[in-house]
Amino acid sequence: MYPPAPDQSADFLKVFDEERQRIKAWRKNRGVPEDDGDGRLDLIGLAFSGGGIRSATFNLGVLQALAKLEILRYVDYLSTVSGGGYIGGWLTGMIHRLAGGMKDVEEGLDPSQVNQNNLPQKAIAHLRAYSNYLTPKVSALSADTWSLFSIWSRNTLLNLVTLVAGIAALILFGRFVGLTSMVTKWTAGFGWPLAAFGFAAVTLALTLKERLPRRFCKDSGVQQLVVLPALAGAILMTFHVHAHPIQDWVPGGMALSVLFLVLQLVAGFWGWFLHHHEQKMAAVLGGLLQLGVAAVSGFVTIWLFYAVSCGVQHYAGKPFAPWLVLTVGPPAMLAAVSLGVVLNVGLMGRDIPDSNREWLGRLGAWAMIYGTGWLLFFSVAFLGPLALKAGWSAFAAWAKATVTLAWVGATIGSLMAAKGAKTSGEQNGGTMNRVAVAGPWVFLLGFVSLIGLGVHELTLGPVKAAPPAASASASATAQLTQSGWTMTAIFDSQGGPAKVAVTPWDRYWGEMAVQIRSSLLWKNPYDQAGISISWYQGLLEVMLLAVAITLVMAWRVDINEFSLQHFYKNRLARCYLGASRKREDRHANPFTNFDQNDDFPLNHLDDPNFSGPFPIINATLNLSSGRNLAWQESKGASFIFTPVYSGYDTGRDASGTSTSRRMRVGGDADGAATPTGYYPTQLVAKTKYEPETGADAATALRFTNDGIMLGTTVAISGAAANPNQGYHTSTAVAFLMSVFDVRLGWWLGNPAGPKASSNGPIFGLGYTLAELFGTTSADSAFVNLSDGGHFENMGLYELVRRKCRYIIACDAEQDEELGFGGLSTVIRMCRTDFGAEINISLSQIARKPDNKPENFSGCHYAVGDITYADGTTGSLVYLKSSLTGNDEPADVLGYHSAVPQFPHESTADQWFDESQFESYRALGYHIADKALGDGRAPLSAAKTKQDFFGALKGCVDPPKQNS
C-alpha cells in the first residue's frame, strides 16, 4: 500500500499524476506494456452508466465479452455510476482477492471456458441467486421483506420525533411570546430603545461593511449581524405598541427613536461624503443633505410604525389579537423599515454610491424572505389548527374521509414522483412532475397544521380537567383578565366547556387564552374560586421540553446511521462484494445472513500488487445553494472516490470561470488556484466495522484509519432516492423526502475542510435542516453526497477530464424512447467544463420517428471522435442497451416479446427474476461482442491501439458535428 503524501490535500494535477503512477505499475502486473511508446500513456477508459441492477447485469455481460476478446486487461480506468458501480465493485473485489488478480478473473469470466468451478463463475452464480438483492426471499411473510419495513419505520419514527419536536418548539415559542404580551407590560420603558437599536443594525453594518471580517460579509454573516437583529427589533416594537396605548409611547419614545435613527443614518453616510467631497464646504453641504434626508425618511418610517400600531391597537381586546399581532406585526414592521430605506435611497439620488444601493437592495431581499417566512409559518401554525377544528366539526363524514384520503394520496403520490426516474424537476415535465411540484406543498401545509393542532390540544389538556367546585352550582365562571381585555370562559361541573352557543372561531381563541392559566406538569390550574394560580408556566415547560427533545435526538440519532443508506449498503455488499469472495471464506451471521468482511476499505486497492483497472466511483456533490452561480441549474458537481484520493474539483471558481479549462492545457500557475477538495482516501471517513464471526467480543467493534469502505462508496454512488439530488432538487420535495426518511445519501466530511477525516457530523441538526430545505453547499464542514447520476449518469465526465485516448461507454440507463439524454448531458458538460468536443452520430441506434416500443434500432453501438482542448484526439465507442430484432439470441427476443419494456424496464424494479437477469446479461454480452469482436483480431494482436480502435466503424454513419 502506498503511503499518503506528506501534504495531505491535493489539486487535480497532483491527483492525476498519482493515478498515472499506479496505472503504469498495474499495467505491468497485468502483463501489458507500461507505456505506449516514448513514455506516452494512451489511456483506455471503460464507463458503466447508472441504472440500478439493470445496468449492473447488462454490464456483467459486457465484462464477459471484454474478457473473451482480451480487451479487459488493457483497460486503465473503470469509471462507474450507480448500478454500474455494483458490478464495478464486484470486479475490483475479485481482482483484489484472487491471488492471480486480473489473469484469473479474465480467464474465469470468459464464458467459452469449460471450467465452471472457478471463482468468477461461482460469483456469477451468487449474483443470480441474489438478483433480488434488497429482499432475497420475496414473500409477504418473508423476514427479508419485513426487515425493509421494520428498518424504514424505525428510522422514520426516530427522525420524525426530532422534526416534530423542533417544529412544535417553534410553535410553542410563538404562543409563549403571544401570551407574554397579554399578561405583562414587560416592554415598558425598554421597547422603543431596544427596537431602535435592532433597526440601527442596518445602518451600523452599512457603515462598517468594508471593515468587517470576510465571513460576516457573506449572506450568512449579514443575516446574523443585520437581518436577525432587525427582526428582533420588529418583534419588540410590535409587542410594545400592542401592550401600550399609542398616547403612552408617542411623545418620549418617538423623540428618542427618531434621534437614535437619525444619528445612525448620518453616521452611515458621513464617511462616504468626507471621502468623496474633498472641499470642506462640499462636505458640510453633503452632511446637511444627509441629515435632512435622514430626518425626512426617519419621520416617514415613524409614521409607518404609527400606521401599523393603529392596526394593532384596533384589534386590542379581541380574543385573537395576540396571535394576529404575532403573525402580522413583525413582517409589517420590517416592511415599514424597508419603505423608509427606499425613501432614503430615493431622496439621496446620485449622491449615494451604487455599491450601497446594491447592498441595501440585497438586504431588502433578505428582509422580505424572513418576513414572508415568518408570516407563512405562524399563519399555518395558528390558523391551521383552527381550520382543522372548525372544518372537521362542519364536514360530513364522507367529506372528512375525502379530505383525509386526498391529503394522504397527495403525500404518497409526491413521494413516488419525487424518486421516480421520470421526475426531472422541469415545470412542464408531465403529470409526474406536476405531482412532484404541487404535492409536497399540500403535505407541508397539512403537516405543520397537524403539529399546530397537536400543540394546541396538548397545552389545552389541563383546561379540560375539572376545577374545584366553589359551590354546588352547575357551572363555574372563570374571569381571565389579560392586558386590558376580559374573556369569560364557562365550564360545567365536570370541567368541560358549558353547552352554550359559541362559534368554533370564538371557542378556539378562547382555548388559546385559557392556556395562559395552565400548568402541565404540576399544580391544579384553578383555585377554589375557579381562578388560575399558575399563569403560563406550563407553556414554558412544554416549550423547553420540546427544545430538549430536539437537541438530544439530533445529537443521538445520527444523520447517517439512521438513514436508509446502511440498509442499502449492507445488501449491496452481501450481493456483489460477497460474490467476490470464496464461499469457504464467508462466515455470515446465521440470523441476518450478513458477513461484515464482505466489505473492505477502498484504499486497500491502492496496492503495488493490484492488477485491475484504476476504479473511479462517481457520486454527486449536492450544491442546492452556494455562491457559485454556474451550478444553479445542475445543483451539483462531480465527486469521486478512488483508492488514492477522494473529493471534488468544481471546475469553476466563485465567478463562474472554468478553472478546469485553465488546467487542461498543461496546468500552469493560473490553474493552481482551482477550488478543489481532494483528500487521501486512506484518511477519508474513519470507518467502524466488525471482524469475522467468532472473534473476541471485546474487539467486536473497533475503529480503523483505513478510510471509507468500498461498499459505502458504491452505495453513495447509487443513492438515487435522496432529498437533495442534483438537477432534480426541489425544496418542497426535499422536505417531504426528509420527513419520511427517503434518504440514501451520505453526509461526509468536506475533503476541502478541517473535518475531512470525519465520517459524519456528531450533532446533525443543522445538516438535517439543510436536507429539509434543500440548502446543501460545499461551504460547510460536511457535504451531502448522492447518486452520481444526479450530476452525470454515463461515467464519462471524469474520463474526459483525464483525457483518455479511448473510451468504451456502456449505456444501460432507462431510455425507452432512445432520447440519449444521459449522453447529451455529458457531451454538453465536457464542452463547457473541459473544452472537449465529442462528435458522434446516433442515427442508427435511434428508433423510427414514431418511437414505438416495438420498433427496433438499426445498430447497438456507435463510434465517435473526441477532440480535447489541447488538440489531442481520441475515440468513443458507445454501447447502447438496445434491440435490433435480427441478431440477438432467441431467448433475449423471447423475453422482449413477453416484456415489451425490455431492455428499458423501470429503475424502480430492483427485484430481478432469473429470466430477467439472464436476458440483460446476455444482451450486454451480445452487444459488446458485436461491437468490439465480430470476427476482428483481438486488441493484443493489433500493432497499436489506434489500429484496433480505428477499425471500429461498424454499422454507424460517419461522425458529424453536433450543434
Q: Where does each model-flagged region fall?
A:
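Interfacial juxtamembrane loops and adjacent helix segments
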Residues: 24
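Patatin-like phospholipase A catalytic core
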Residues: 1-10, 18, 28-29, 34-963
